[in-house]
Every structure is written in structure tokens, then in C-alpha cells.
Amino acid sequence: MSKNDLLKILKEQLKTDGFIIDGIFGSYARDENTDNSDIDILYHLEKEFYTKYSGFIGFKKLDEIKNLISTTLNKKIDLAPKNNLSKTAQKYILNEVEYV
């Protein structure tokens, strides 16, 4: 099973919590990844997330989600929140996102 297929499965599991995986970017999206590459994941949060996980509990949940994805894919991952990207990050990241 490919990493993209696994991401689609994770996306379905996590969306009930209001955590939405939009896609990947970086070396994996450009097919330039190496064995040492991490996987960069673009995501956004929906209202359900804030309702279920308010305050610091939300930060803990994000860390749990990051660990779940990393363990499932057996890779280090970086999470980038779509709604909080700087203008510079938007310019580079949004142009190369491979949506799942």
C-alpha cells in the first residue's frame, strides 16, 4: 500500500475529530524524496476539533495525531496548518500540494 493510500485511510479516520488532511507537499509531492525525507502534510481543522479539544487539550491531540501518522507511515512527518501559512509559505506550498 502506498503512502498516499495510507493517508487517504488516515484522512477518513481523523475527519470524525475535525482534523482534515488536505494533502502532501515537499519532496514527496515532487517525487524527490529519499530514505531520509520527512513527509510534509497540509491540514486544516474544522469546528468539531475545537468543540472536542479546547485549549491545551487541542495541542495534545495534534501531537497524538502527528505521532499516529508518523507511526502508520513509518516516517518523520511535519504538519502545516493550511489556515495559518505565511504569505511566503502559501506561495511555495499551495502550488505543489498533492491533494488526497
Outline where the language-model segments fall.
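Catalytic core of pol beta-like nucleotidyltransferases
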Residues: 1-23, 29-35, 48-100
